[in-house]
Amino acid sequence: MIKSTYYQDLTKMNTFRMKVKAKCFIEYDSVADLVDIEFDELSRPILHIGGGSNLLFTEDFKGTVLHSKINFIEILDECQSIPEAPSQASLGPSPNPGVGKCLLHTNVTSSDSAEVLVSVGAGVIFDDFCDWAAKEGLWGVENLSYIPGEVGASAVQNIGAYGVEVKEVIKTVYCYDIVEEEFVSFSNEECEYGYRDSIFKSPEIKGRYIVTHVVFALSREPRPVLDYGHLKDAVMSACGECQSASEAPFQDLLPQETPAAEKTTKRITPEMIRKVIIKIRKEKLPEPSVMGSAGSFFKNPVISYEHFHKIEQAAKAEHGADFKVPHYELSDGAVKVPAAWMIEQCGWKGRRSGGAAVYEKQPLVIVNYTGEAYPEEIIGLERRIIASVKDKFGVELHPEVDHI
């Protein structure tokens, strides 16, 4: 079914809760619906949104906003040849994305194999997918738990958290090309993933491809990623005394009535790590339903080692010889420094500017503090933060949030 609305209020469709409208809003339930949309007749520009969690609407949108409700999760347990044209009225199991060529899922595994391919509709809430995977005992997306947004947008943005990026588990992204009016697929390599970036965000093709579904390569074998920041400490604390994180019994996360003997035999699972991640995120980040935000507003800057050394020496002079600047060394010799640390060092944590503010628990987040903030107030605060970080550290921050 296709639902079209003119001058649609988008307040509840963006997590910043900007009070804006779209000239035209179209919501569709299936691939068949997507094919039926007359894109040549739509008001331009065209914007496809997911959960609206990485957007800052700066004004009313003068074109057409589209939203997918393609909602399914399916384990691909046998090689599936995709028909040439979609025939289902709604996309449930066994989606039909192929038009003009046969799309073939290769290397699909059986139930006793380590790798498990999972096909997920673009309209599925990403955290619902994480929850499903954890409950199925499948590894790969547990560190990405509680990130707002939908599956289609996750593949475009290359979302990441706690040492994991979604590109690490994406095998294939299936899309509808609104220019050629055909379905196409992009392998992981063809997506050209970078830090919060992909080919779908490049100016040359941005908006041309609409994600219909994504195939993820998850694992039945334990593959915990715990080497980011203090995550391992949080996991170890949650599991009590244990010999290794990969075999850790999460005693504190088990029901209180669980017998002690049974607790000692419990081993780490994706669901257990998911619970730890959610606990951390709830402590650090605002609930969008309570206080509007887009999550992390800025990208973490990547600088040369020489530049980092200068920053560290200045920090030691300011805070003492034992002070350590948080950082992550990359394989090419460059260094990634947390933007949150830089912003806090510039004194922005908890500061307000009109209806906007830097979140008091996480300076990487700009919030709609009053619920009535204007886009200009968000942008003004953003520019002042960028200027102060540039002045103090010689580093220019770049927003992760798309300005529309």
Q: What do the PLM-derived regions correspond to, one by one?
A:
Residues M1-G92, N96-V173, D177-V179, E190:
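Anion-binding (especially nucleotide phosphate/pyrophosphate-binding) glycine-rich loop
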Residues T5-Y7, T11-M18, L55, F183-E376, ...:
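Phosphate/pyrophosphate- and phosphate-bearing ligand-binding catalytic cores of soluble enzymes
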Residues D40, S111, G137-G140, S202, ...:
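Generic detector of short alpha-helix boundary/capping microenvironments
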Residues G121, K135, Q345, D391-K392:
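Residues at alpha-helix termini
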Residues I385:
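Phosphate/pyrophosphate-binding loops and the adjoining catalytic core of nucleotide-dependent enzymes
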